[in-house]
């Protein structure tokens, strides 16, 4: 075997490899002899087929298999001999495999960079913490009370905000009734915004037995494209009006919601309010950590990974164009620079986290997959069971979660064991503003 190293610098290793024709022919001959004992050919006893017959019938495919096997063995030998930390599949070029010449080819191998893990203990980050106050809790209790109102008291007075109204209605567009525009014995709480914007407000001041003309415009993004953006006229019959008995928030109220006391229900809501912001906080904390890491990392990255990441970015941008892409109005040069910078950031951080996970021997457990599937399910409200069933019935889809699951586990390990976290307390209103600002920022990265 002959090896001529053509390039061994940065993350690229190129070599020209050759192996004598005699060795190839020996391997082919040996394989053909083995086949004479296995193949069945009409007119010959089993195991007695002449090698010339076998060669005529199988020679081409045997040679192809031997060449492929020899190339793989030679490439693996090169990788081991030069201790190459490769990424992806080696590329075989300029292959010379004529039957009367030595086997020669050029192999091009892309390498992973040597990564030095920075001192993560020097990183310091603020961690937002929601300071839940009694007013936040009382607002949630009042919302719960509003949802559980009993509309039992019939009212003969004029309709006001908060009343429950039972109606019949027929909708018209240009004086023609349209499909889906008819309501019978429909109950709506005024101010709940259950119906099209402006509909409920036009019932205020009417009484049971009145006929009311309601004029509305369907929103442009209405689910029925035949109605979106169109003006409509509804003829509404007021059949009944009910007011709710006042809901008293007391110990008995709390017991309706599996709480032993009102204080226990308040504690439950305080914890719920805290938890509602946790996922958003964790996402922002992760991006803030990545911002710090980006400044510490300067190693070269494999070109193939960079191109792959740029293609993902382009695909994401194309998918979200209708949302008003940040690249709208940018020159092709600016767009290229954006893709290059962001792809480099993502690849560097991804490689560092993979190296760190390997160094710390972090392994995925079943609970890690459950956690990330739960995160996926939360993105599809009302379809959670469908998401769970999908992953349960598609083991290969679970494989696709390994990368994100290990990244999340590694980031959490770094938060728990490496960097310095300083708690910064926010009121609910302050935290909502902070999260909104940060979510807009990280949407760009």
Curated annotation (Swiss-Prot):
Domain notes: Consists of 3 domains; the N-terminus binds the ribosome, the middle domain has PPIase activity, while the C-terminus has intrinsic chaperone activity on its own.
One function term, GO molecular function aspect: ribosome binding
Subcellular compartments: Cytoplasm
The protein's name: Trigger factor
GO cellular component term of the entry, any: cytoplasm
InterPro entries assigned: PPIase_dom_sf (IPR046357), PPIase_FKBP_dom (IPR001179), Trig_fac (IPR005215), Trigger_fac_C (IPR008880), Trigger_fac_C_sf (IPR037041), Trigger_fac_ribosome-bd_bac (IPR008881), Trigger_fac_ribosome-bd_sf (IPR036611), Trigger_fact/SurA_dom_sf (IPR027304)
Function: Involved in protein export. Acts as a chaperone by maintaining the newly synthesized protein in an open conformation. Functions as a peptidyl-prolyl cis-trans isomerase.
Superkingdom assignment: Bacteria
Record family assignment: Belongs to the FKBP-type PPIase family. Tig subfamily.
Enzyme Commission numbers on file: 5.2.1.8
Disulfide links within the chain: none
Substrates-to-products reaction catalysed: [protein]-peptidylproline (omega=180) = [protein]-peptidylproline (omega=0)
Species this protein is from: Rickettsia prowazekii (strain Madrid E)
